Amino acid sequence: MKKFLSALCMTALSLLVYGQDGHPSSISGNRRNFSFAWLTDVHLNSFAYAEDDLRQAVEDINANPDVDFTILSGDVTEFGDTKEFQLLEEILKGFRKPYLLLPGNHDVNWSENGCTMFDKIFRASHFCYDWQGVRFVGCGAGPSLRMGPPHIPREEILWLDSVYNATPAAQPVIFVNHFPLNADLSNCREVLRILKTRNTQAVLAGHLHVNRSYDADGIPGVIGRSSLRRKDPIGGYNLVTLRGNTLEFHERIIKTE
């Protein structure tokens, strides 16, 4: 499937998707028009301002009537301990619309209980969510050993394969993981093999804390900024809109005044 990532700058990305015959593919063949917020690398409990940045983001998203749901793509805590997950749960309860949550390496492999507590509190480390005919599929990630290379656990691979097998061939899919699908991910080829069995239109990732486009072996990929403010006065996140045949990414800097 031929796909083009048409534009990239600090504040906007645009994804144009075409079928093999040069005509718009199924993601653009319908009059879909919706938006979602995308947060990643929240790192709750890393800096004194991390909690405030997340709370401000939740309030900002709630105040935007155009946002239909929110995706959080991993490293939502710094050390993955129970108190961090409990605080995260309390903050995320503030969302007035659905949110989809994935763990990253900081959430599941940097503590003794991360692997079990994330699933216990948030019920699952993956999601499959349909919105206006588009399927959003996300699976958990983390190194197989503490401080090891990026890796998607075997149980998540098996789950991903089962979800893709059950997905209609023509249905557009957007895949989400904490790690970019590149050579740094130890089992990247296995993941890409699964993604290419269906109509995967784009892949979203975090981990690197920057807005950037990349080529995931022929599938358009986008890496998102961290919600942390760092040197800015306040944090931010990305707003993603599917409008016709274009998937648009806009950086949102939270306004507090």
Question: Which residues are covered by each model-predicted region?
Answer:
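N-terminal active-site segment of His-dependent metallophosphoesterases
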Residues: 19-86
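Short, solvent-exposed aromatic-acidic interface loops
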Residues: 250-257
